[in-house]
Amino acid sequence: MDLPGPIHDFLLVFLGSGLLVGGLGVVLLPNPIFSAFSLGFVLVCISLLYILSNSHFVAAAQLLIYVGAINVLIIFAVMFMNDSEYSTDFNLWTIGNGITSLVCTTILFLLMSTILDTSWYGVIWTTKLNQILEQDLISNSQQIGIHLSTDFFLPFELISIILLVALIGAISVARQ
């Protein structure tokens, strides 16, 4: 979107804070239904961030695939589960939780130090040069198809396998 600077910055901060609040809701809410709705909120915020960065096709795909299909499937799977599974044996803190928290905190600080130490000027300049070269050649949907079949083939296939495993897991949980 071609918005003035302050409005763009406000929307960016608003959506970023929505992502943080929604992510905390996914992790911290004890009720799995509320956690699934919080995940849907996070996915919608990500889609709005794509719209804010002029990636309308990716935003539409995000809404249709993740919010419209995957999150609805997760909500149905959670609704078919027994509530007794979550109400009994609720430990507030275990050793596994501590190890997981330590690993996640370490990864967070490593990412923050990497982001702060990276020279983003060169990355932005290279990206702009590539965009200038690719803009004249073909349309946006053709560019997406070329990148998905060449540069992003392996990540695209890995994501499709992860989604397939999530679908099979959700169906098996729902059947039990």
From Swiss-Prot:
Q: What is its EC number?
A: 7.1.1.-
Which GO molecular function entries does the Swiss-Prot or TrEMBL record give? Answer: NADH dehydrogenase (ubiquinone) activity; quinone binding
What top-level class of enzyme does the UniProt entry assign? Answer: translocase
**Where is the protein situated, by its record's location annotation?**
Plastid, Chloroplast thylakoid membrane
So where does this one cross the membrane?
10-30, 32-52, 61-81, 92-112, 152-172
Under the subunit heading, UniProt states: NDH is composed of at least 16 different subunits, 5 of which are encoded in the nucleus.
In its UniProt entry, what is this protein called? NAD(P)H-quinone oxidoreductase subunit 6, chloroplastic
Biological source species: Arabidopsis thaliana (Mouse-ear cress)
Q: What is the lineage of its organism?
A: Eukaryota, Viridiplantae, Streptophyta, Embryophyta, Tracheophyta
